[in-house]
């Protein structure tokens, strides 16, 4: 009956919806020929638990806390969690500025309104000070005034802003239910119902409908629907069906989530997306009694956060769509004030408090404490009052292992220690969404990959030493290319179907991508050896038969990168090394990446080739120019942007077999000699 109610609640949406780019929109609209009969989500809607606990019927608040639990939280705020709560109160955004007036269509404006509602409402329920209640009302009124939740030309009412506002207004309505007038409750409830209907109709199962379960544009809006469903569960007949739909979709979201804790979209998207996974799991557990946390990707998530962080604590190993690369690292660019407000890295590290609490993980708590010492900041500090377990014994970061291998995504991280002066590096050679995805695609035929935030970067590496990011990635791009990474080009071409839009992996068989892998990891006291095979990362039209890279680090001696490359037809092969600032030519065939007072010395050579004549290394130093992300709905249509420089090292003539060798060593920038290590 509830499934029928959802179907009857359908509202026709505008046809002119825009996705991230044209190809992604077409994939979203296309019906899958693999799906026959009833959509798989309907069975999940019937069988998965989504009923509100009987004791919560007719009760407010209930989504995340009850009145009894609020009493306990008020005591925490004055005792064990006093410092955390003071920090949260100092950052209540609804007290610092008015909400944007309608239509509030600037990027992320409505997202902030949603978070501000929840923050101010919760602060009021803990403090009892009416200034927080008045601020929450003001922001809720603003949300009601927005006719469209989101962007009018890009999935209006059904995308990220809708998820944020349903979450904020849903929980705000639930928390403040008894503090609002009858007229206010009616007005807020009617707006919530209207917006939830729009979103539920968009996400409901339809014949042939596919879902990008692992992509944030699915689980962020659907989290908002789930929160609204539990807030309104017994106040509108459609709400139970919304809860069913959300639980069904989340069944697949969790099943397709990372097996090893690594987040494929990149650390910027871990920061942005992970709160919504936690918000749904917490709301669902509190509302229904069902705990969905116990999955390897959540147990291991703190490893991804810890090892992604650079020793400096102000940036990360930035595989995937992450900020603006060299610009952000230099404190420049349009994104820096958002990513580093007042110079503090915004990481949402307090999410690890929740994982530490749930899994009783002293390691996760230790990672969070380490990030806090760097002065990092969170979007929702107020959650720390609920999440932080003051009784949990912390494992300090210094006692945790300083390297980690993520076997499902085939990404490796190593550092000499946990100090700011550590030498650290990372190496990546795996399929965009992990090895488990190939089997899952067979199991879930309605799962549609949307891997645009992952990059064509197999067999690439990032190096950090002496407090400097020496070489690595380019950051978030509208059109990701292999040339943005420290990897290989074949006749100037890179991996997968790069250059055709934001998703370089669209329409590439995952069976081919799944052969991309790290084949050896050896960590010894005297050396670290990583071998990666990226042969099938490249399209068959390029004729690449073999691309195996060995990446070796020996403390005191530096790095050695050895590449074995074979092709079916002669091709010019090019290695790329990136610099945030500049690349300099030291001597004939010798180069350096300069990073302030430090430089990375580069000595390349070709050891063997199919050409009987000696093969020279041809070099070029170029500005690294890319397509920056465009506006919502046209991410691949951004402006051209310069981010650092790149060194291109090529065979002097087409060849079918080559062994490249690069020796990399770190020295002070004022040293004039070239290392022979």
Briefly describe each language-model feature range.
Residues 2-14:
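Bacterial N-terminal signal peptides
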């Amino acid at each position: 009956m509830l499934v029928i109610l959802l179907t009857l609640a359908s509202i026709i949406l505008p046809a002119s919806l825009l996705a991230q780019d044209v190809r992604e929109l077409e994939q979203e609209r296309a019906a899958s020929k693999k799906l026959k009969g009833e959509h798989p989500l309907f069975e999940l809607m019937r069988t998965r638990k989504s009923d509100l606990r009987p004791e919560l019927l007719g009760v407010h608040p209930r989504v995340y806390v009850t009145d009894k639990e609020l009493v306990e939280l008020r005591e925490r705020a004055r005792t064990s969690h006093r410092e955390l709560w003071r920090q949260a109160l100092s950052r209540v955004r609804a007290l610092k500025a008015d909400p944007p007036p309608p239509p509030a269509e600037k990027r992320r404006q409505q997202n902030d309104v949603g978070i501000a509602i929840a923050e101010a409402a919760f602060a009021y329920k803990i403090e009892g000070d009416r200034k927080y209640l008045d601020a929450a009302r003001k922001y809720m009124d603003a949300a009601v005034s927005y006719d469209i939740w989101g962007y009018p030309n890009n999935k209006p009412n059904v995308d990220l802003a809708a998820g944020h506002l349903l979450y904020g207004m849903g929980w705000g309505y639930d928390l403040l239910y008894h503090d609002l007038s009858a007229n206010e409750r009616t007005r807020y409830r009617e707006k919530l119902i209207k917006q939830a209907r729009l979103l539920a109709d968009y996400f409901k199962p339809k014949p042939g409908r596919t879902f990008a379960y692992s992509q944030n544009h699915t689980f962020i809006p659907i989290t908002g629907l789930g929160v609204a469903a539990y807030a309104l569960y017994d106040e509108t007949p459609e709400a139970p069906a919304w809860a069913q739909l959300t639980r069904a979709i989340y069944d697949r979201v969790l099943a397709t989530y990372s097996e090893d804790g690594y987040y494929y979209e990149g650390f910027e998207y871990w920061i942005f997306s992970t709160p919504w996974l936690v918000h749904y799991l917490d709301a669902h557990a509190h509302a229904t009694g069902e705990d969905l946390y116990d999955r390897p990707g959540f147990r291991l998530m703190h490893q991804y956060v810890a090892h992604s962080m650079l020793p400096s604590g102000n940036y990360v190993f930035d595989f995937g769509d992450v900020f603006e690369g060299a610009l952000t690292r230099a404190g420049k660019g349009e994104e820096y004030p958002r990513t580093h407000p007042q110079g503090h890295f915004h990481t949402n590290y307090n999410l690890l408090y929740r994982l530490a609490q749930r899994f009783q993980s002293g390691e996760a708590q230790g990672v969070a404490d380490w990030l806090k010492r760097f002065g990092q900041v969170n979007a929702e500090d107020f959650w720390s009052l609920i999440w932080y377990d003051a009784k949990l014994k912390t494992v300090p970061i210094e006692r945790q292992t300083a390297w980690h291998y993520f076997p499902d995504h085939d990404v490796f991280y190593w550092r000499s220690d946990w100090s700011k002066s550590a030498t650290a590096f990372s190496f990546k050679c795996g399929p965009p969404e992990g090895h488990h995805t190939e089997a899952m695609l067979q199991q879930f035929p309605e799962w549609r990959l949307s891997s645009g935030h992952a990059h064509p970067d197999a067999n690439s590496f990032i190096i950090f030493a002496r407090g400097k990011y020496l070489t690595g990635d380019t950051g978030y791009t509208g059109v990701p290319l292999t040339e943005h990474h420290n990897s290989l080009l074949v006749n100037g071409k890179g991996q997968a179907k790069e250059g055709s839009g934001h998703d370089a992996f669209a329409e590439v068989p995952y069976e081919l991508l799944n052969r991309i892998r790290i084949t050896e990891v050896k960590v010894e006291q005297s050396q670290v050896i990583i071998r990666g095979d990226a042969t099938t990362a490249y399209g068959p039209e390029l004729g690449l038969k073999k691309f195996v890279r060995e990446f070796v680090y020996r403390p005191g001696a530096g790095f050695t990168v050895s590449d074995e490359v074979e092709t079916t037809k002669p091709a010019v092969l090019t290695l790329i090394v990136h610099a945030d600032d500049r690349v300099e030519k030291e001597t004939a065939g010798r180069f350096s990446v300069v990073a302030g007072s430090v430089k990375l010395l580069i000595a390349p050579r070709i050891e063997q080739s199919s050409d009987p004549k000696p093969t020279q290394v041809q070099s070029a130093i170029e500005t690294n120019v890319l397509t920056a992300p465009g506006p919502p709905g046209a991410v691949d249509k951004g402006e051209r942007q310069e981010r650092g420089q790149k060194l291109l090292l090529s065979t002097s003539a087409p060849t079918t077999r080559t062994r490249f060798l690069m020796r990399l060593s770190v020295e002070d920038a004022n040293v004039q000699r070239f290392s022979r290590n």
